[in-house]
Amino acid sequence: MEEFQGYLELYRSQQHDFLYPLIFREYIYALAHDRGLNRSVLLDNVGYDKKSSLLIIKRLISRMYHQNHFIISVNDSNQNKFLGYNKNLYSQMISEGFAVIVEIPFSLRLVSSLEETEIVKSYNLRSIHSIFPFLEDKFPHLNYASDVLIPYPIHLEILVQTLRYYVKDPSSLHLLRLFLHEYYNWNTLITITPKKSIFAKSNQRLFLLLYNSYVCEYESILLFLRNQSNHLRLTSSGILFERIRFYEKIKYPVEEVFANDFPATLWFFKDPFIQYVRYQGKSILASKDTPLLMNKWKYYLVHFWQCHFYVWSQPGRIHRNQLSKHSFDFLGYLSSIRPNISVVRSQLLENSFLMDNAMKKLDTLFPIIPMIGSLAKVKFCNTSGHPISKSSWADSSDSDIIDRFVRIGGNLSHYYSGSSKKKSLYRIKYILRLSCVKTLARKHKSTVRTFLKRLGPKLLDEFFTEEEQIFSLLFPRTSSTLKRFYRGRIWYLDILCINDLVNHE
């Protein structure tokens, strides 16, 4: 009966957007813990103490409401114990539970949108590789592309204010403000690097929720501007940034100043060939029109971030390049538009002649130099690309060492299966293969030549991926099908995150 009562409370909260009572329900934190276990591939799960108590969570929340913020103690920052319990542990539990609760409106909106569009296999759209077929289809017809780095909010209050458009419960938002003020430096500039973040790994889900709501708000307005510029030709549209009256048609001149003292018009956005893709904090804005239009988009985005989100952004963070002459770095690939020339023989009566048919295609290359730099950082090779032994793994068992190297090589082969030229990828696999042999030889105090003679070709076969093994069994080495497999591009729909070696920025 208690289980049904919990589901009833969850259902009522979904219907009325009143999420605050769920914070004091123990099954919410059990759900957050289970989700952490299921998502251990994406986020590191630190687990929970067996002595965790919902009563301690309630006391922490009550303390946040009743404390005097005008009295600042020097030793407050060093106090990690609260009533004899680990304060950081319970702050992590509150953040995890709050993230699960606030995700409810977003999940309901996602389910309804998928039902309206009749998308059955929505999990395929979550794959990173699903972006590249879109790029192959759209980008060969475009001329210019701008690399856009989305700025981070300088104040956490901006994230909370953005979240209120989607969460209609003031009590939950007020608790979020108190929580961020209690456990994090309120005035800290948000900078995300692989090694340092104001949010610890244990609180990544809460940060991702806040940041994604900020990006969702930015993209919803950007999409609205793009759609209005394509369809409204006779009447200009004034952008009202209050979501209650999202937009309205106006009859005033186009020089009309919009809300927040933000002068802008939609007249220079009339380009039906604008395409936009994004992953994390980097996006690509491509167009078929002139460079003048791309420059207008560039300065519009800078002013838009400053006036609406109060985020300082410099024009230098947006780089405009011509697709036919420059490559753009996106999702670990170096992509560019290259002409694909095919010769066609035409026969007209007794005369025949050859014609060159040039078609543009997206070329995705493996970034060999940045990848060697990534391997050098983790001590698989030196900066010149020469393999070295992984000394920190020499104490492990032989099977563990081989499994680690095989797993890294398999992940890289799986992710870069869409590379147009795989010669550079084979060089990286060679570095990992020889680094594995040198690590094993160092462990057994032997030479590489002697160790290879002892193991034979079995060690090298471990580095073949599952797809390569299947194709090598089905087709002979000289068959054209096997050659097309090694040369062709393959996009997978099960890649949900980028490996640390791939993310070499």
Swiss-Prot record:
Molecular function per GO: RNA binding
Subcellular locations according to the entry: Plastid, Chloroplast
Major localization listed first in the record, in broad terms: plastid
UniProt keyword Chloroplast present: yes
GO cellular component: chloroplast
InterPro entries: Domain_X, Maturase_MatK, Maturase_MatK_N
Job description of the protein: Usually encoded in the trnK tRNA gene intron. Probably assists in splicing its own and other chloroplast group II introns.
Family: Belongs to the intron maturase 2 family. MatK subfamily.
Protein name per the record: Maturase K
Annotated source species: Rosa stellata (Star rose)
Biological classification of the source: Eukaryota, Viridiplantae, Streptophyta, Embryophyta, Tracheophyta
